[in-house]
Design a protein with these regions (language model features):
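TerminUS-proximal long segments
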Residues: 10, 308, 314-359
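Gly/Pro-rich turn-and-neighbor structural signature
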Residues: 40-129, 247, 252-283, 287-297, ...
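Intrinsically disordered, low-complexity regulatory segments enriched in Ser/Thr/Pro
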Residues: 160-167, 174-191, 312-329, 333-334
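Glycine-rich, often proline-containing surface loops adjacent to acidic residues and nearby aromatics
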Residues: 100-102, 138-142, 179-189, 234-254, ...
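Internal mixed beta-strand/loop scaffold within catalytic domains of large alpha/beta enzymes
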Residues: 87-184
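Compact, glycine/acidic-enriched structural inserts
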Residues: 169-219, 359
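N-terminal regions that are enriched for targeting/export leaders
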Residues: 2-35
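Extended, acidic-biased charged interface segments
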Residues: 198-284, 288
Length: 359
């Protein structure tokens, strides 16, 4: 059970020395110069996507580190044993601001396993029309995946993922991809609801979407609400954001620019929220509730998340990177039920209803 509201034992001694920087780097992507790869149409798209995800990783790590006084991200570069790709895992654990944060890049290729091919064909009729169930296919994917679990219960957890996936006929890879799409999104998972924070997060993502298609935000917001649902609990994982997959409705160049803007907008949408909440005092009550909500977060990632399941089905996959999204600590209490009218109950109302946060 959540400790009594009268429990005022203050935790989080680390907040006493935390200072919010006057300027958080890399949060003004609209006015920053575009990198060389942005308009480099002479370079193959898969190489430009690799450059994009590495750039997004670097810029987000710098922004997150600007708030953390005691630790830096560990950069762990790894190579697949079969030589078909690499990754860079940037991880920070046991910091004063971040209990666990991971910003991972993976650039890999291989052969689609039968289960992966079947899953792709079942979820999308257009994919089923382009991929023969009896044929072998190779794939190439470059992506960046982010999960941040702050220490302070009032600072929200957040997730971001952007990737490009290409599929080739194994018998004729030189002909180019028979299928290619972009996927990704960003979403917010608070333990305590600050409506202004949620509105700011959604509005920032909406601005990035609107710059490319006014239908993107409402479409991807609804998709996010549907996808990030713990069906067994009848609640969403958090308060949403945007989510899309199998996106090929525009020219690859335009979709690449959208991925750049949406991926960059996450830094602006999220890191200032951590800065805003990381110095708030909290007690054992708030800490325990945060851990309970993290338990629900872990349930979604292990039971429903498509990326986690795809990774676990991939031969030679790096399990440490796949499970990076799990929180460092979590809590499961038998028959936990917040008191009516409490801040915890207010959060549950938000994850059990649909709200237009961007209006």
């Amino acid at each position: 059970m959540i400790p009594n509201a009268q429990d005022t034992r203050v935790l989080g001694s680390e907040i006493a020395d935390l200072k919010v920087p006057a300027v958080i780097p890399n949060t003004d992507y609209e006015n920053e110069a575009k990198p060389a790869y942005y308009n480099d149409t002479a370079t193959p798209m898969h190489q430009r996507m690799e450059a994009l995800v590495l750039d997004l990783q670097d810029r987000l790590v710098v922004a997150l580190e600007s708030l953390e006084p005691s630790r830096k991200f560990i950069r762990d570069r790894w190579e697949r044993e079969d030589g078909n790709g690499y990754g860079i895992s940037c991880v920070l654990q046991d910091g004063e601001v971040y209990e666990k944060a991971g910003v991972n890049v993976s650039v890999i290729e291989g052969t689609l396993a039968p289960g992966q091919l079947r899953s792709m064909r079942e979820r999308n009729p257009q994919t089923a029309n382009k991929l023969n169930a009896n044929e072998e296919y190779d794939f190439r994917v470059a992506g960046v995946s982010v999960v941040v679990h702050p220490r302070n219960p009032y600072a929200p957890t957040a997730h971001k993922n952007y990737r490009r996936f290409e599929v080739y006929r194994k018998s004729n890879k030189e002909a180019g991809p028979v299928l290619a799409w972009f996927g990704g999104g960003a979403d917010l998972t608070p333990a305590y609801l600050f409506e202004d924070d949620v509105k700011y997060f959604h509005q920032t993502l909406k601005q990035a979407c609107d710059a490319h298609d006014p239908q993107y935000y409402p479409r991807f917001k609804q998709w996010c609400d549907t996808y990030f649902t713990n069906i067994h609990r009848d609640e969403t994982r958090g308060v949403g954001g945007i989510f899309f997959d199998d996106l090929e409705d525009k020219a690859p160049e335009e979709l690449f620019h959208f991925a750049y803007d949406a991926g960059s907008a996450f830094i602006k949408a999220y890191v200032p929220l951590v800065a805003k909440r990381m110095t708030m005092p909290y007690t054992l009550r708030e800490r325990n509730w945060q851990l309970i909500r993290r338990g629900h977060y872990a349930e979604f990632n292990l039971v429903y998340d498509r990326g986690t399941k795809f990774g676990l089905m991939t031969p030679g996959a790096r399990i440490e990177s796949i499970l990076m999204s799990l929180p460092l600590t979590a809590r499961w209490e038998y028959m936990n039920q917040p008191e009516p009218g409490s801040p915890e109950a207010h959060l549950l109302e938000a994850v059990r209803t649909t709200t237009d946060w961007a209006k």
